[in-house]
């Protein structure tokens, strides 16, 4: 694995754990950990963009609302699927 990809993974893992509210820290970090090993570089970039939305927007995304505000539908589908299992 190249160092750029590993740096991006580390950044995502850190950001997923330290969001703001404890509930979202737990939810987002579990979501990220469940998918991160299977993502290519492009998907990692999309995931990084997704988790940089505020908690309220991420909750709406996980409920299938406001999905037009995020371009990567595959990552959104993974978030919704994870929420439905969680």
PLM regions: where:
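Positively charged, polar, low-complexity stretches
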Residues: 2-86
């Amino acid at each position: 694995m190249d160092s750029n990809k590993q740096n991006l993974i580390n950044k995502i893992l850190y950001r997923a754990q330290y969001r703001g509210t404890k509930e979202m820290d737990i939810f987002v970090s579990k979501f990220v950990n469940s998918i991160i090993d299977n993502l290519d570089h492009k998907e990692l970039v999309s995931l990084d963009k997704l988790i940089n939305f505020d908690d309220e927007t991420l909750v709406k995304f996980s409920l299938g609302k406001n999905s037009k505000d995020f371009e990567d539908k595959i990552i959104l589908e993974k978030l919704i699927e994870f929420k439905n299992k969680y």
